[in-house]
Amino acid sequence: MSEAEQLIAKADKKCAPVSGFASFFSGSGSYRFEEAADLYTQAANLYRIQRKSNKAGHVFEKAADAQIKADSKDEAANSLIEAYKCYKLDAPSDAARCLNKAVEFFALKGQFRRGANFKAELAELYETKMADPKHAILAYEEAGEWYRGDSAEALANKCYVKAADLSCSDEVQDFLKAAESYERIAKESLNNSLAKWSLKDYFFKAILCRLALNDYPSASALLERFVSWDPTFEKTREYEFALKLVDGLKEGDPDIIASASHEYDQISRLDNFKVKILNKIKNNIRDSDDLAEDDLT
């Protein structure tokens, strides 16, 4: 039996129910569970040293269970965070489960800033390791709310933007929600000197999302609204580009979209996010043309 296994066996014994005369010598239940948690933690760290991450994560969870029984929820949350770190690379679903439980403890304690930090990590885990954009969106939005409650506006906006971006993903495609999110973020950033540099990007993304919904009247109305919020927007390349895109959709001409995109890309490189939505706008026009031809035959 390895040293880690011996420590686990001792801890398991301390966690076992004790009754009758034996309970007189075993000490209080709380103390026994605290001792067991210490033993589990030692064993988990040994597994860590041996690079047996999944085993370490499992034993950190056992430590958390013992700490909960000892009514040491703060310690339990910390053990669950350690379990999450161990699972993160090879067992992301277990990592997410542990992180969720830890965040619940932080929330119950009113530690919303710490909870927000780990909620954002959870969202990133869903996004990058588990390919689960829907859960990632929910986690980013909740992290944003907690950051906002702690007056961390920049961090809140970062989470809200991530959620909005994921709402535009191929798996979700909720462009209405994304458009409304970008618009709200922009409005709340108007008087923020640091966030003001990002305004034109928020404006442009909101308009793109409306165009992806074939809703050029709303996109055109947004252009006017954004200029009323920030008159400098009218002098940007993003405004000129958006104006041409609205015209292209209104005319039902994908070539206008393609030409405007190429012209903009020559000076300001379009990222993959925007390219995908621009392609969707073009394809929507072509699809509607095909349907119109079918109606005539």
Curated annotation (Swiss-Prot):
One of its GO terms (biological process) is vesicle fusion with Golgi apparatus. Signal peptide: none annotated. It is a peripheral membrane protein. Keywords: ER-Golgi transport, Membrane, Protein transport, Transport. GO terms for cellular component: cytosol; SNARE complex; vacuolar membrane. It comes from the Eukaryota. It is found in: Membrane. GO terms for molecular function: ATPase activator activity; soluble NSF attachment protein activity; syntaxin binding. Disulfide bonds: none annotated. SUPFAM superfamilies: TPR-like. It holds the Pfam family SNAP. Its main location: membrane. Gene3D superfamilies: Tetratricopeptide repeat domain. Belongs to the SNAP family. Required for vesicular transport between the endoplasmic reticulum and the Golgi apparatus. This is Vesicular-fusion protein SEC17. It comes from Komagataella phaffii (strain GS115 / ATCC 20864) (Yeast). The lineage of its organism: Eukaryota, Fungi, Dikarya, Ascomycota, Saccharomycotina. The gene is SEC17.
